[in-house]
UniProtKB/Swiss-Prot annotation:
Source species taxonomy: Bacteria, Bacillati, Bacillota, Clostridia, Thermoanaerobacterales
Keyword vocabulary terms for this entry: 4Fe-4S, FAD, Flavoprotein, FMN, Iron, Iron-sulfur, Metal-binding, NAD, Oxidoreductase
CDD domains documented for this protein: OYE_like_FMN_family (cd02803)
Catalytic activity: A + NADH + H(+) = AH2 + NAD(+)
PTM comment, free text: The N-terminus is blocked.
Species the sequence originates in: Thermoanaerobacter brockii (Thermoanaerobium brockii)
Name of the protein described by the UniProt record: NADH oxidase
EC number: 1.-.-.-
C-alpha cells in the first residue's frame, strides 16, 4: 500500500513524466569545486536525495556569466563546454536512482558583491542599490543585455547536452531576471524597461531564444517571486500577470516563490514562519494558468504536502531544507514511516548562515552527514563491539548515543533529569522556536529505535560509571550559565534571574513590568523577545557595539524587525557596573554614567562548560573519556550534534 496517494502519484511537466510530486528545489551548497566544476562531494549529495525517493531535483543555481553573475563562493559554472563532463556525470548518477533533474541557470545581477565577482562592480537593469548587501550596481548597456541573453541560451544548450531533463530560469528572489521584471529595480526608459510589457522583454526574449535553440518540447521551468513583499516591488496581482505571460511564452511549469534580498525572511524563512505559509501564492497563480505549478516554503510534513496536492492548490510540492535534514524524506513517507522523518527546524545556521555569510560548505544542524554523504554514506559497523556510557541527554549526548548504537556498540545513556533534551527544551521556548521540539522528539525516538538503554533521573557519578566497566565514556554534561562579577548579581537577590530560568518558565513577570536583560547575544535577545511578547518593557544592555552578532544573519534581520514592533530597546557599548533594586548602573566607553530602570534583571552573560572534575576522576581510574558538546566547547546546537556524531563515529 502506498501512503499519501496524491503525493506519490505520477506528475507531468510537458512530456516529461515524474515519479511523484516531490521536488527538491535549487539550494546553493558551496559543494562545487572552487573553479565551478562539479565535485564528487556534490554528486554524492544529490545522489543521496535521488536514492531517497525525490521525484525531481532542480540543481542549485548555475552561473551563466562568470564572474559577473556569480553570487556564492563555490558556485557551479556552465559558461564553457569544459564543465559539461561533470554535469553529465551528475545527471547520470541521479537518473540511476529514478529521479529526474533540471538545471537552474542564473545571473546574480545586483545581488552580489565585488568580493564574490572578483572585484567587478555588480550589474543591474538600473543602478538601484541593494540595501541588504550594501552594494551599488551599474546599469547594463543594451549590448551587455544582448550578450547575457545569449549566455543563458548557451547554458541551456549545454544543459540539454549534459542529459539534464530540463532547465529552470531563476527569475525569483531579486536576481537579474527578476530585477528586470520588477518596477522597484527596473527604472529603464528603453525597450527593456518602463511598462510591464517592456519589463518582461528580457525574460521573454531568453525563453524565446532558448526554445529556438533546444526545441519547443524541452522542459522549461520558471521560478519567480509572485509577491516581492517590498515597497515598490511586484505584488501578487503583478505576479498573476507575469504567470499568464510566461505561459503564453511556452514555459512548461511555474515555480512560485516570494521575496527579494530586501525582504529576505520571506524567501529564506527563519523558524517563526509557519509550515506552508507561501502555498496561497501558488494557489492563486494556479487559478490563472493551465500549466503545472510548484509550491514551496516551509513544507516539512508529508501529511501537509499530501493535502496540498489533494486539494488542488498546487501540482508539485518543493521540499527544500527538509531534504537537507533528511534525504530519505520521500522514502519514509511512502513507506508510512513519516514519524521517522528528521524534520528541518528552520534554524538556517548551516545551510544558509555559514554558507552565505562565511562562504563555508553546506552543513545542517539536525543532520551531521549533510554535505559529507560520500564519507558517511552508511553507518558502518565497528569491528569490535564496545560498551559505551554517555553522560548527558542533550543534543550532543543523544546524537552520540544514537551513532554509537547504530555502529553496533552497547550504549547506556544517563540523564540526571527525568526527561531528555537538555538545552533543546530551553531553546524551543523562545518565540518562534517551537520547531526545535521536533528535533528533540526525533532524537528521543531514534534512541529507542537504535536500542540505546536510557537511564533518566539518575546522576551518573564516577563510581556509578566505573561499576559498569565501560570501554568508553562520552561526557555530554553541557554547560551552565555564568554569573558575572557585578555588584548586586548575587543569587540571593530576589529580582535577579538567569535567562535559562526565564525561558524555562520558572520566573513570572507582570505585564508592563520593566526588565533589563544584561547581555545582547543570542540567548539574551531571545529572552528579551520572550519577555516582550508577554507584555514586559524590555531593555537590553550590551557591552559590544551591537546586539545579536552571534546570530544567523537572516534570523537576526527578522528578529530586529520583531524588536521594533515590540518596542524592545538596546543600550550598546555599555558595561553594567552595579545591579540595584530599581535598575542597573552602567558606564559607556567614554566613561559616561547611565542608569536604566528595572523591576527585574535578567542575566544572559554566557555559559561555561560542566564536567571537568568528572572527566579527571574517570581518567584517574583508567577509563577512556571523550568530551563533546558544550562540555567541550560552548557553541550552538549544530556544534553539539556534529561533535556527538564525530566522536561516536570514531569509537
Amino acid at each position: 500500500m502506498t501512503h499519501f496517494p496524491n503525493l506519490f502519484s505520477e506528475g507531468r511537466i510537458g512530456n516529461l513524466v515524474i515519479r511523484n510530486r516531490i521536488v527538491m528545489p535549487p539550494m546553493a551548497t558551496n559543494l562545487a569545486n572552487e573553479d565551478g566544476s562539479v565535485s564528487q562531494r556534490l554528486i554524492d549529495y544529490y545522489v543521496a536525495r535521488a536514492r531517497g525517493g525525490v521525484g525531481l531535483i532542480i540543481l542549485e543555481n548555475v552561473q551563466v556569466d562568470y564572474p559577473q553573475g556569480k553570487n556564492v563562493a563555490c558556485q557551479l559554472r556552465l559558461d564553457d563546454d569544459k564543465y559539461m563532463a561533470g554535469f553529465f556525470e551528475l545527471a547520470e548518477a541521479v537518473h540511476s536512482y529514478g529521479a529526474k533533474i533540471f538545471m537552474q541557470i542564473h545571473h546574480a545581477g545586483r545581488q552580489t558583491t565585488p568580493g564574490i565577482t572578483e572585484g567587478l562592480q555588480p550589474v543591474a537593469p538600473s543602478p538601484v542599490p541593494c540595501s541588504f548587501l550594501g552594494t551599488q550596481p551599474r546599469e547594463l548597456t543594451i549590448n551587455e543585455i544582448e550578450e547575457i541573453i545569449q549566455k543563458f541560451v548557451d547554458a541551456a544548450v549545454r544543459a540539454k547536452g549534459a542529459m539534464f531533463d530540463g532547465i529552470e530560469l531563476h527569475g525569483a528572489h531579486g536576481y537579474l531576471i527578476g530585477q528586470f521584471m520588477s518596477p522597484r529595480t527596473n527604472r529603464r526608459v528603453d525597450k527593456y524597461g518602463g511598462s510591464f510589457e517592456r519589463r518582461m522583454r528580457f525574460p521573454l526574449e531568453i525563453i524565446r531564444r532558448i526554445k529556438e535553440a533546444v526545441g519547443e518540447d524541452y522542459p522549461i521551468s520558471f521560478r519567480f517571486s509572485a509577491d516581492e513583499f517590498v515597497e515598490g516591488g511586484n505584488t501578487l496581482e503583478e505576479g498573476k500577470q507575469i504567470a499568464k505571460m510566461l505561459e503564453e511564452a511556452g514555459v512548461h511549469v511555474l515555480h512560485v516563490s516570494a521575496g527579494i534580498y530586501e525582504s529576505m525572511p520571506t524567501l529564506l524563512e527563519p523558524s517563526r514562519f509557519e509550515q506552508g505559509w507561501r502555498v496561497y501564492l501558488a494557489e492563486e497563480i494556479k487559478k490563472v494558468v493551465n500549466i503545472p505549478v510548484i509550491t514551496v516554503g516551509v513544507i516539512r510534513e508529508p501529511e501537509f504536502a499530501e493535502k496540498i496536492i489533494a486539494e488542488g492548490r498546487a501540482d508539485f510540492v518543493a521540499v527544500g531544507r527538509g531534504l537537507i535534514a533528511d534525504p530519505e524524506w520521500p522514502k519514509k513517507a511512502k513507506e508510512g514511516r513519516q514519524n521517522e522523518i528528521r524534520k528541518c527546524i528552520s534554524c538556517n545556521i548551516g545551510c544558509i548562515g555559514g554558507r552565505v555569510f562565511q562562504n563555508l560548505r553546506l552543513r545542517c544542524t539536525v543532520n551531521p552527514v549533510a554535505g559529507r554523504e560520500g564519507v558517511y554514506s552508511e553507518i558502518k559497523q565497528a569491528p569490535v563491539k564496545k560498551k559505551v556510557v554517555v553522560v548527558g541527554g542533550g543534543p550532543a549526548g543523544m546524537q552520540a548515543a544514537i551513532t554509537a548504537a547504530k555502529r553496533g556498540h552497547q550504549v547506556i545513556l544517563y540523564e540526571k533529569k527525568q526527561h531528555l533534551g537538555g538545552q533543546l527544551e530551553i531553546a524551543s521556548a523562545s518565540p518562534g522556536k517551537a520547531k526545535i521540539k521536533w528535533f528533540r522528539d526525533w532524537l528521543e525516538a531514534e534512541l529507542s529505535r537504535a536500542g540505546v538503554e536510557v537511564r533518566s533521573g539518575v546522576t551518573a557519578d564516577a563510581e556509578t560509571i566505573a561499576a559498569l566497566s565501560p570501554d568508553y565514556v562520552i561526557l555530554a554534561t553541557g554547560s551552565e550559565p555564568v554569573t558575572p562579577r557585578i555588584k548586586g548579581a548575587e543569587k540571593e537577590n530576589t529580582f535577579v534571574f538567569q535567562a535559562w530560568d526565564v525561558l524555562a518558565g520558572k520566573v513570572s513577570f507582570d505585564k508592563d513590568e520593566e526588565v533589563v536583560v544584561i547581555g545582547g547575544g543570542l540567548v539574551g535577545c531571545e529572552t528579551a523577545h520572550y519577555l516582550a511578547e508577554k507584555g514586559a518593557k524590555v531593555t537590553i544592555v550590551e557591552m559590544l557595539s551591537d546586539i545579536a552578532i552571534d546570530m544567523e544573519p537572516i534570523s537576526r534581520f527578522d528578529m530586529m524587525q520583531q524588536f521594533t514592533k515590540l518596542g524592545i530597546s538596546a543600550r550598546t557599548g555599555k558595561v553594567v557596573t552595579e545591579i540595584l533594586p530599581r535598575g542597573v548602573a552602567a558606564v559607556g566607553k567614554e566613561g559616561k554614567q547611565d542608569f536604566i530602570r528595572a523591576h527585574k534583571v535578567v542575566l544572559a552573560i554566557g555559559q561555561s562548560p560542566v564536567g571537568n572534575e568528572l572527566k579527571k576522576t574517570l581518567e584517574d581510574k583508567g577509563i577512556d573519556v571523550r568530551v563533546i558538546g558544550d562540555a567541550y566547547n560552548v557553541g550552538k546546537i549544530i556544534d553539539a550534534v556534529s561533535s556527538g556524531f564525530q566522536v561516536a563515529w570514531q569509537i
